[in-house]
């Protein structure tokens, strides 16, 4: 079973964690294990805990990393089939209550998820409207498209996809579903194309790209779980521990930037002679500006074009 995926900003993400040989680390988005493989090569006696809510990714990892999953393995890998928003709860279940030395995130959908036609993530393949990263979840894209109000649909398309024709698309969806339910990705693609003016369809890539992105974000509550997970990650990091986050969309990057700022900057009331301990920053930024892919990586990995890496350290 292969979950082939080319990791973006591989060395930058892991090297900025400054891995320790005996450290305890978390891969919040295990996927194909590209970042994990590189980190494990840096920790001789340490442990990596890999999270993924996609059962297919976990099963693939169990085969591809079988030797490192043995109890006496050094370094050791442990896998968790759950969303990274449940970080602290799962660490406690595994017996890790003293914090971690580092954590990293590679956000968004992986290449294998896009390429699995039946998952319904891609507008390039005809499949049932699904888009669930966790197949045990009830809510899927079919439900959103066929049950939300026109305003709710328009808000999702605009807020999560920056789709400037969100109202027109939402209106067309509601009109079409009156005739019959919208079941497949290609049905939705045709509706989107029909809603967007001809001049706009000729530029800016595939006309359904932004709408599919927005629905995926909504189905998986991606922004809410990201914020919750980052808060927990900062809490469980040991002093000196680091957090690396790769984002691909502006709304993801805004959340990371906002939370890093929240914990690294302090507003001290004027005239206060000292900063109380509970007001002191708990993070320091390792890089003020996001790290982006090198020219070489941009040439070899198209997915890296929109990637931004932010790194912070626990004080």
UniProtKB/Swiss-Prot annotation:
Domain of life: Bacteria
A Gene Ontology biological process term: rRNA base methylation
Enzyme Commission number: 2.1.1.199
A Gene Ontology term for the protein's cellular component: cytoplasm
Catalytic activity: cytidine(1402) in 16S rRNA + S-adenosyl-L-methionine = N(4)-methylcytidine(1402) in 16S rRNA + S-adenosyl-L-homocysteine + H(+)
GO function terms (MF aspect): rRNA (cytosine-N4-)-methyltransferase activity
Main location: cytoplasm
Protein name, as recorded: Ribosomal RNA small subunit methyltransferase H
Organism in which the protein naturally occurs: Lactobacillus acidophilus (strain ATCC 700396 / NCK56 / N2 / NCFM)
Encoding gene (name): rsmH
